[in-house]
């Protein structure tokens, strides 16, 4: 870090003046949902790892992930700062931890998607809310912690370019006594932000409306570092980007570089980009094992109401064919609970999944997330504001055409039909024996136990 620019000299000077290093506790809370969330292998929390990477230069850091079995202490006397990351699903738990630490006189920081979207609510449970990404407010925040003069909200006036992004230090997660609970897929980030601004999405608020990206060489260097650490080429990566293909030229150049490394990877990709056969060819050649695709609905009226122009129903089968041709599995997302949904929506979805042999279908109920335009539109119809149930699996409001009872009846029936043994064999026959098979049989067991009451 340069000692001649902006606030950095003050930060370095303050750090040098400290007689001892302040102690930080970083917390990843678990959720309280009854559904299959935060169970089994969980992804390493990249955002919290980034906080640890930044903070460890000036402070002593303890890293706890409650999802893996780490215990959050009742007594915070050993720490000066307690920093908690939160999304809507674990917000109540994050608030409980924050309240406890705040009552003990600690500096409490709460950041993440939910506190960014509902800053006033989150501010009741902490000293300071980190609005959006911490990287863009880090110097200001660290200086204030040294001085002991905190602001109620830290919000960047300008987001930093990703060219200055510090590579994440995964040792904070990997050195945990419960590290075996983490998925073998290593989270990686190449881009941030999205200018599209869909009414149901939080990305533009959290990461900005401009599309930012890291230099390709830096992304590849991070992959090489993991290959060296693990002593093998076929390291598996999961891109955390919301819209990595927004700039096709950048994405294609990144894949060309990855093809030379021999890695394996998966990502969320926009539907319209996958219509091009050359994209699937390069994705397969660069080691793509699975694409996560938001099909959302087989109802054209619903797609139109979502303003999701990237989804063209007439191209769905071509997209699937392109990926399957290059042995890329599909994690397909389907949402139910729209006002225009009918029983025909479920049948059309079942037919599409079975005919196109979608390897890993994921079904959710329409959930208006707080802070989004869609939430404001639906607020008067939402059944409750119990954040523990905002997991996209609980019934949030009654759709006009179908009604709540029929919605849940058909939702459960569809899951059972898609994940019954014979359906799994039809969809998966001849495909590689890997974790996708395992997940299908886990879902077979899970869906047999479903009842409407679980979704209320």
From Swiss-Prot:
Species of provenance: Chlorobaculum tepidum (strain ATCC 49652 / DSM 12025 / NBRC 103806 / TLS)
Pathway: Porphyrin-containing compound metabolism; bacteriochlorophyll biosynthesis (light-independent)
GO molecular function list: 4 iron, 4 sulfur cluster binding; metal ion binding; methyltransferase activity
Cofactor binding note: Binds 1 [4Fe-4S] cluster. The cluster is coordinated with 3 cysteines and an exchangeable S-adenosyl-L-methionine.
Domain Radical SAM core: 178-405
Binding site for [4Fe-4S] cluster: 194, 198, 201
Protein name: Bacteriochlorophyllide d C-12(1)-methyltransferase
Pfam families per record: Radical_SAM
Gene: bchR
EC number: 2.1.1.331
SUPFAM superfamilies (alphabetical): Radical SAM enzymes
Compartments where located: Cytoplasm
Function: Involved in the biosynthesis of the major light-harvesting pigment bacteriochlorophyll c (BChlc), which confers a significant competitive advantage to green sulfur bacteria living at limiting red and near-infrared light intensities.
């Amino acid at each position: 870090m340069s000692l001649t620019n902006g606030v950095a000299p003050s930060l370095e000077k303050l750090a040098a003046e400290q007689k001892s290093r302040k102690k930080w506790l970083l917390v990843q809370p678990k959720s309280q949902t009854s559904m299959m969330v935060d169970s089994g292998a969980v992804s390493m929390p990249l955002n919290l790892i980034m906080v640890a990477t930044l903070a460890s230069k000036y402070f002593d850091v303890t890293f706890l992930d409650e999802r893996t079995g780490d215990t959050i202490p009742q007594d915070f006397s050993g720490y000066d700062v307690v920093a908690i990351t939160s999304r809507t699903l674990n917000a109540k738990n994050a608030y409980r931890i924050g309240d406890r630490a705040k009552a003990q006189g600690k500096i409490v920081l709460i950041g993440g998607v939910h506190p960014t979207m509902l800053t006033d609510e989150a501010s009741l449970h902490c000293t300071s809310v980190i609005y959006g990404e911490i990287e863009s407010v880090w110097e200001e925040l660290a200086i204030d912690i040294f001085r002991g003069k905190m602001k109620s909200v830290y919000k960047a006036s300008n987001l930093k370019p990703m060219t200055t992004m510090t590579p994440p230090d995964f040792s904070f997660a990997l050195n945990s006594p419960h590290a075996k609970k983490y998925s073998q897929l290593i989270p990686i980030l190449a881009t941030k932000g999205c200018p599209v601004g869909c009414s149901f999405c939080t990305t533009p608020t959290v990461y900005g409306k401009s599309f930012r990206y890291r230099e390709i060489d830096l992304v590849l260097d991070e992959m090489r570092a993991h290959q060296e650490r693990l002593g093998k080429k076929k390291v598996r990566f999961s891109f955390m980007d919301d819209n990595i293909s927004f700039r096709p030229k950048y994405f294609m150049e990144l894949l060309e570089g990855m093809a030379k490394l021999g890695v394996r990877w998966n990502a969320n990709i926009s539907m319209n980009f996958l219509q091009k056969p050359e994209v699937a060819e390069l994705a397969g050649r660069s080691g793509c094992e699975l694409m996560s695709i938001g099909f959302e609905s087989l109802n054209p009226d619903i797609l139109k109401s979502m303003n999701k122009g990237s989804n063209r129903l007439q191209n769905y089968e071509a997209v699937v064919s392109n990926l399957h041709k290059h042995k890329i599995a599909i994690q397909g997302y389907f949402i139910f609970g729209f006002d225009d949904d009918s029983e025909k929506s479920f049948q059309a979805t079942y037919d599409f999944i079975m005919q196109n042999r979608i390897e890993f279908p994921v079904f959710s109920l329409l959930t208006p997330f707080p802070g989004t335009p869609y939430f404001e539109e639906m607020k008067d119809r939402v059944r409750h504001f119990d954040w523990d149930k905002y997991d996209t699996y609980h019934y949030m409001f009654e759709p006009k055409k179908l009604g709540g009872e029929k919605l849940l009846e058909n939702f459960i029936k569809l899951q059972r039909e898609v994940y019954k043994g014979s359906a799994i064999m039809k969809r998966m026959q001849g495909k590689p024996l890997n974790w996708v098979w395992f997940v299908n049989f886990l879902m077979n067991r899970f869906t047999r136990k479903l009842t409407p009451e679980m979704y209320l």
